[in-house]
Amino acid sequence: EEVKEFHEKWLDERRHYDRFNCIDDEEEGVYRLLGNCKSIDCAMGGIRMDGKIAAYTIGSYCPSIQCAFIHIEKAEPEIKGLYNYINQQFLIHEFPDAVYVNREDDLGQDNLRQAKLSYKPIRLEEKYYIQEKR
């Protein structure tokens, strides 16, 4: 419940910057994942500052390929380095055997893409779009 409250606050503060309505599209997926974290074997971590959630992340791990998948990561943007810190600590504590980390889609947002590229990925996957033929 506390994570949902933090997420709603995070959304409200960013909606006026969202030129492509990505936040609204993402919101439904976030709430579904929050509601089903345990049943789909996801791990969740958070950071508290002054007694309140300042960041949270949700991910999963595939041992056969030693890869952690970071599905969601949100943090107070005013706190410099918090995104990096939660990313580091979550991987250390939840997925210490991970050799690879999949940071998933950047939703076509330049700032998100730049942040993900700053981790110096070893490979970027091609994106494909499927359209139903009518």
Q: Locations of the language-model features?
A:
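Aromatic (often tryptophan-rich) hydrophobic motifs at membrane interfaces
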Residues: 43-133
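A sequence-level detector of short, solvent-exposed, charge-rich linear segments
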Residues: 22-29, 120, 131-134
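A conserved beta-strand-loop-helix scaffold within acyl/acetyltransferase catalytic domains
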Residues: 1-76
